[in-house]
């Protein structure tokens, strides 16, 4: 049996600044794959903690890291890249991710063009509509993480 190699990564479930009054979550459409909506995520650099990577990645991808961390998923979750997907991480079979549930402090602070853009546009959608919108190969992981945050009382919608 082959040993799979996974890239360490963080991902952010970003609730709107109006949470918990509204149950809207941030998603963004990738620049390189039209119609591919997802949560912000990115690799963990050597010597960096997952929390440090979270703040760095959010600043790079959405132009702000002004967030309140509400919870962290307690384990790594791995997923494989789809075989038909071209990706920039050819030495990896997929990614192992550490998920954070966060609340954005100021919606007007989002700037997708602050660094090299990874997303073409973004929106806040109701959490109940999330799984219909995002790329299919991430749905199971998103479902698992959201169920955990709900079950543990961190996500009240």
Curated annotation (Swiss-Prot):
Enzyme category, top tier: hydrolase
Any single GO CC term annotated in Swiss-Prot or TrEMBL for this entry: cytoplasm
Every Nudix hydrolase domain range: 5-147
Pfam families xrefs: NUDIX (PF00293)
UniProt keyword annotation of DNA-binding present: no
Alphabetized PROSITE patterns for the sequence: NUDIX (PS51462), NUDIX_BOX (PS00893)
CDD domains: NUDIX_Ap4A_hydrolase_plant_like
SUPFAM superfamilies: Nudix
Any one biological process term the GO annotation gives: mRNA catabolic process
Keywords per UniProt: Hydrolase
Coiled coil: none
HAMAP family xrefs: Nudix_RppH (MF_00298)
Record protein name field: RNA pyrophosphohydrolase
Species assigned in the record: Helicobacter acinonychis (strain Sheeba)
